[in-house]
């Protein structure tokens, strides 16, 4: 089992944790419908970058 040789100082502990910060996911607004969606994903209505790429079940 791994055991530390020396105690890690609060500064080094903070540096170790500096990469653990959470980031907010990128959210985009669809220009045609005004709905929000994740970047590089289609909106719930099936639109992507102003074009309808997926038909709704009601339209099919």
Curated annotation (Swiss-Prot):
Residues 1-60 are annotated as: Disordered. It comes from the Bacteria. One of its GO terms (cellular component) is large ribosomal subunit. Residues 9-19 have a biased composition (Basic residues). GO terms for biological process: translation. The keyword Ribonucleoprotein applies. GO terms for molecular function: structural constituent of ribosome. Keywords: Ribonucleoprotein, Ribosomal protein. Belongs to the bacterial ribosomal protein bL32 family. NCBIfam families: rpmF_bact. This is Large ribosomal subunit protein bL32. It comes from Paracidovorax citrulli (strain AAC00-1). The lineage of its organism: Bacteria, Pseudomonadati, Pseudomonadota, Betaproteobacteria, Burkholderiales.
